[in-house]
UniProtKB/Swiss-Prot annotation:
PROSITE patterns: REACTION_CENTER
Additional note from the record: 2 of the reaction center chlorophylls (ChlD1 and ChlD2) are entirely coordinated by water.
Main location: plastid
Location in the cell: Plastid, Chloroplast thylakoid membrane
Consequence recorded when altering residue 275 to P: Herbicide resistance
Species of provenance: Chlamydomonas reinhardtii
Ligand binding (chlorophyll a PD1): 198
Residues bearing the modification N-acetylthreonine: 2
Gene name tied to this protein: psbA
Site feature (Tyrosine radical intermediate) residues: 161
Name of this protein: Photosystem II protein D1
Lineage, highest ranks first: Eukaryota, Viridiplantae, Chlorophyta, core chlorophytes, Chlorophyceae
GO biological process, one term: photosynthetic electron transport in photosystem II
Chain sites annotated for binding [CaMn4O5] cluster: 170, 189, 332-333, 342, 344
Length: 352
């Protein structure tokens, strides 16, 4: 009899735990994805802070020339970064127990792999948690779909690109100047500025900013007056009110006359879908472009594509970009090789 009661109590305890995890009444929704997300993001954040402050130099190129990235080793907030895992490790899974000692693990950049793996798993679960909460509240799933764009971009620079290039040392460093270094080297090696998917991403980000500013300013400019001149216009809104807070007809009429009639949305739902879809699709394309360039399917090459009747090259902006790319590549990993692979062939050298 005692055993039966104990089983019921245990079952009840597990049921209460499940109910608490999946309850939408909690101040912060946890969810089953949150059970994985919370420890992963806490681990990634903790290790990042410790490594950014105190990690010793890392042999990123695998040539016994460590690069300092932490604050205690001479960097500041701008120059500091968590240095990627060493090229000597390549794509091998490199947890602490795979190293002979903690010093070796730190020297080979083990913290970078630990942070990236936990961070990516954490943001994947955050996206799943968005879907899970939407599902339990009876909402549509588009919040998680929109979040998939930055998740795809993070996956491209932290996971897909290192896989394509054969080493985690090619991943994006976790710091400000390290990010810029990654961008410059990416341009030098893959000519990303001439890749159409990157162009779509630029259109998505800048276009999304423009549309967001346009929408916000139009709404703010066509608020329905509910206050006096001596009160803030924001006081005219009460959370949960049924009445419209701005005049969409006035906003539609203004913008339609400013540009032309069909440039203005007359449907609030389709307008907000467009505001979400434009940057999301653009960033999707950027992530896809990064993932293809990871395997060296690079941007367009229009070098020396214009010649005169005598066969002499007429330089275009493509040739100017190519010269800049070569200069950046010469400075990249200058101690790891004597010259970039582009300059190793006689054809490339003769073109210069």
């Amino acid at each position: 009899m005692t055993a039966i009661l104990e089983r019921r109590e245990n079952s009840s305890l597990w049921a209460r735990f499940c109910e608490w995890i999946t309850s939408t009444e909690n101040r912060l929704y946890i969810g089953w994805f949150g059970v994985i997300m919370i420890p992963c993001l806490l681990t990634a954040t903790s290790v990042f802070i410790i490594a950014f402050i105190a990690a010793p130099p890392v042999d990123i190129d695998g040539i016994r020339e460590p690069v300092s990235g932490s604050l205690l080793y001479g960097n500041n907030i701008i120059t500091g970064a968590v240095i990627p895992t060493s090229n000597a490790i390549g794509l091998h899974f490199y947890p602490i127990w795979e190293a002979a000692s903690l010093d070796e693990w730190l020297y080979n950049g083990g913290p970078y792999q630990l942070i990236v793996c936990h961070f990516l798993l954490g943001v994947y679960c955050y996206m799943g948690r968005e879907w899970e909460l939407s599902f339990r509240l009876g909402m549509r799933p588009w919040i998680a779909v929109a979040y998939s764009a930055p998740v795809a971009a993070a996956s491209a620079v932290f996971l897909v690109y290192p896989i394509g290039q054969g080493s985690f040392s090619d991943g994006m460093p976790l710091g400000i100047s390290g990010t810029f270094n990654f961008m410059i080297v990416f341009q030098a090696e893959h000519n990303i500025l001439m890749h159409p998917f990157h162009m779509l991403g630029v259109a998505g980000v800048f276009g999304g900013s423009l549309f967001s500013a346009m929408h916000g300013s139009l709404v703010t400019s066509s608020l329905i007056r509910e206050t006096t001149e001596n009160e803030s216009a924001n006081e005219g809104y009460r959370f949960g009110q049924e009445e419209e807070t701005y005049n969409i007809v006035a906003a539609h009429g203004y913008f339609g006359r400013l540009i032309f009639q069909y440039a203005s949305f007359n449907n609030s739902r389709s307008l907000h879908f467009f505001l979400a879809a434009w940057p999301v699709i653009g960033i999707w394309f950027t992530a896809l472009g990064l993932s293809t360039m990871a395997f060296n399917l690079n941007g367009f090459n229009f070098n020396q594509s214009v010649v005169d009747s005598q066969g002499r090259v007429l330089n275009t902006w493509a040739d100017i970009i190519n010269r800049a790319n070569l200069g950046m590549e010469v400075m990249h990993e200058r101690n790891a090789h004597n010259f970039p692979l582009d300059l190793a062939s006689t054809n490339s050298s003769s073109n210069n």
